[in-house]
Amino acid sequence: MQNKRMITILGPTASGKTAVAAALALRTDGEIISADSRQVYRRMDIGTGKDLADYVVDGQPIPYHLIDIAEPGTKYNLFQYQQDFHEAYDDICSRGKLPILCGGTGLYIEAVLGGYQLSPVPQNQPLRDALAGKSLAELTEMLVELKRCNGSNMHNQTDVDTAQRAIRAIEIETYNLENPTPERQLPPVDSLIVGINIDRDLRREKITRRLKARLDDGMADEIRALIGEGIDPEDLIYYGLEYKFITEYVVGRLSFDEMFRQLEIAIHQFAKRQMTWFRGMERRGYTIHWIDAKLPMEEKVEAICKLMQDA
């Protein structure tokens, strides 16, 4: 597999990174590969913030990949993402287009850029049974110790905001400890990395405004429809953030005000953890060229094009 130049555009939630990637794609004849761990799911549109209108620029639809590729209720994982990414990446390159990786899931981004060596991890039912009933705090403590043994930075607190996710993370770390040899190695991908840097106060303001708008647009009804299809509410809670708190509201565990307050706090915390991950990437040797989110779109695209020329 031949490495080709790729552009990566990353940033926290509400930074406007998708619109930047789409504008850049129009300018450079590119196609976007999503790096969002929840936008892979079909019919989970409002809650995951797909904002598909961003993929139309000046009336031109921008091709995108790895959105709407999995069914709600399933548990898409990092190993699957790596395989799907390389399939999309090779396809885009084979047609002479520019791949533009865009998203806020730092784990997915770093996994494909760095060529993380992963194996598909089977379910370990005896382990799951042994962990059942433990609190999230207890599970997190176990996960931290397993990560220490593995020398792993593959998971952070972003990934274990529910007990179910923590158990799966422990299952993965346990498997990797017992099976250190990967089944398949994927190459690192050479990429210019651009970060959209949004002021903390502006980010918080946009998060709150966007949350209100999405609730007005029917985010709770979207979740009711998924439950109406027969999807277990606990499987929706597994996805975290909007799906965790709004599902708990829909099934009667939280009032609307409790849901809104807790969800707003959780999204702010999530955005902060995203930035912590990106700063960690810089410490791990990745160069991220930060661009001010407040710049006009044309200036942002020009700045990225100049970086591409200088690379």
Report the location of each language-model feature.
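Phosphate/pyrophosphate-binding catalytic cores of soluble transferases and nucleic-acid-acting enzymes
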Residues: 1-311
